[in-house]
Amino acid sequence: MENREFILAFQVMDRIIQNNQPIFMLVWVGSVVVLIATVALGIGQLYGAGLMLVIFAALAYLLGVQLPTVIINIPLNNKLQTLDVDAISETARKLAREDFDPRWNRWNLIRAVLSSLASALLIILLFRL
């Protein structure tokens, strides 16, 4: 995909997500609330490996998914949103993409792996109950 089209496509996708889509916001914020509630309930009802599973799942998700989203991916998205791709040169578009794409994808991979780990830990916990 050419630089102009890449930036435009990402801007459109990000604009839709950041436009306070109620379902997206419910899932994104709700996942944090539910996971914190799960840990709070787990502290009172789980012990040993079960408690460790829920705590590690929460840490993986909160520190490995939510935190990088807030401090890395969203700021990168916002920086890309400021570009007027038709008003800048192809060189500027190329530099913007090179500044954005590798870092965003690296952190997105980290978020995906840690989100999968958190899910796997919670599934293991369910089978142990």
Where are these predicted regions, by residue range?
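Transmembrane helix-loop junctions in multipass membrane proteins, especially transporters and channels
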Residues: 43-50, 74, 78, 127
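Membrane-helix exit/interface motif
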Residues: 10-14, 31-45, 68, 72
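Interfacial segments of alpha-helical transmembrane regions
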Residues: 40-64
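Core segments of transmembrane alpha-helices
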Residues: 27-39, 112-119
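Juxtamembrane boundary at the C-terminal end of a transmembrane helix
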Residues: 123-129
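Hydrophobic alpha-helical transmembrane segments
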Residues: 99-116
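Interfacial loop at the N-terminal end of multi-pass membrane proteins
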Residues: 1-29, 81-101
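Inner-leaflet juxtamembrane helices
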Residues: 60-85
